[in-house]
């Protein structure tokens, strides 16, 4: 449970919007009856968008948790632009129906927060990571590993909220930010991290384990690291091999039956 923000079910960022929508809906209902329906629809949408439920948090010290709800759009070896080192990059896209509260993926200490102005292209696109407005949190885990998690604004999301700063200690699952109306989070982990998700997977904030990160730098072989990332990024390769083998067996059986 977040020691600074005890999960009031509805995110505090939505209180003014929901309160205003509820008051306006009631007022129009009293004056105009069914004409208030659009206002009630808006209020219900705001309630679902700003929901912020408490969740059970995995305590495995090697687990790097998903900071948000959403869909995996990137799993690849890439360059961490904030540390200028090779990293395992995992990106999560959030649509307007996901929970948009951001939580810390691990027990860590924030070493730096970097804000970049930018555009507001569709957060589902790869170029959003480098062109959109974004806010990066650089942190060191309790075991000394360096990780980076980046809030990226989207086509509709025009406001990034970050409540942490250099020197702050974050507990896994602790709330540190919020982005409104569709956005993206990029994670940069050490190259020896083992991805536990693949492109297209749906993830749940703080419940889904994105990767397993050894507590110490294992100095894994770069070739095996690249192969691990490639397997995660292309989950259908093994399935394709199985299907090809099955097709060959089926063809052989048909030949036997014809004879």
From Swiss-Prot:
Look up and give the membrane topology term: Peripheral membrane protein
A GO BP annotation: phosphatidylethanolamine biosynthetic process
Pyruvic acid (Ser) occurs at 183
Q: What does the note under cofactor report? A: Binds 1 pyruvoyl group covalently per subunit.
Cofactor(s) recorded for this entry are: pyruvate
Q: Which GO terms describe its molecular function?
A: phosphatidylserine decarboxylase activity
InterPro entries listed in its UniProt record = PS_Dcarbxylase, PSD-A
List the GO terms this entry assigns under cellular component, sorted alphabetically.
plasma membrane
Describe the task this protein carries out.
Catalyzes the formation of phosphatidylethanolamine (PtdEtn) from phosphatidylserine (PtdSer).
Q: Please give the subunit comment from the record.
A: Heterodimer of a large membrane-associated beta subunit and a small pyruvoyl-containing alpha subunit.
Write down what this protein is called.
Answer: Phosphatidylserine decarboxylase proenzyme
Species this chain originates from? Neisseria gonorrhoeae (strain ATCC 700825 / FA 1090)
